[in-house]
């Protein structure tokens, strides 16, 4: 089995459905190509993925001695985190619930043969 480099980030204030749309853009691509795609993606979750991908590349080169130019995104997971519940006051004593959703991201890089 080839060596793998991992990076995780939790409790990010972006919904899972919106983050998965961005994750699907670079799943299976080379790491350098994925960074280029993310830099040209205007979504909020793209900035989180840029930091996460840079962290995974640094883990691969520093901890495992892998070549950064041969890395590709083997797996990427976007999972649902805890939902923060807030209330918006409305007229006549009512309150509407506002759900602030969070996400957990993880990425696994591997060296191409």
Swiss-Prot record:
UniProt function note: This protein binds specifically to 23S rRNA; its binding is stimulated by other ribosomal proteins, e.g. L4, L17, and L20. It is important during the early stages of 50S assembly. It makes multiple contacts with different domains of the 23S rRNA in the assembled 50S subunit and ribosome. The globular domain of the protein is located near the polypeptide exit tunnel on the outside of the subunit, while an extended beta-hairpin is found that lines the wall of the exit tunnel in the center of the 70S ribosome.
Keyword DNA repair listed: no
Protein name: Large ribosomal subunit protein uL22
Entry keyword set: Ribonucleoprotein, Ribosomal protein, RNA-binding, rRNA-binding
Molecular function as annotated in GO: rRNA binding; structural constituent of ribosome
Biological processes, Gene Ontology terms: translation
Highest taxon listed in the record's lineage: Bacteria
Assembly with partners or alone: Part of the 50S ribosomal subunit.
Claim: Nucleotide-binding is one of the keywords in the record: no
Family, similarity comment: Belongs to the universal ribosomal protein uL22 family.
A cellular component annotation (GO) from this entry: cytosolic large ribosomal subunit
């Amino acid at each position: 089995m080839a060596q793998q480099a991992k990076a995780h980030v939790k409790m990010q204030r972006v919904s899972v459905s919106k983050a998965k749309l961005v994750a699907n853009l670079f799943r299976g691509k080379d790491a350098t190509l994925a960074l280029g795609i993310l830099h040209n993606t205007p979504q909020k979750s793209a900035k989180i993925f840029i930091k996460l991908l840079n962290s995974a590349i640094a883990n691969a080169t520093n901890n495992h001695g892998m070549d950064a130019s041969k890395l590709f995104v083997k797996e990427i997971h976007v999972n649902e985190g805890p939902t923060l519940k807030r209330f918006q006051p409305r007229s006549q004593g009512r309150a509407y619930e506002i759900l602030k959703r969070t996400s957990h991201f993880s990425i696994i890089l591997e060296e191409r043969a």
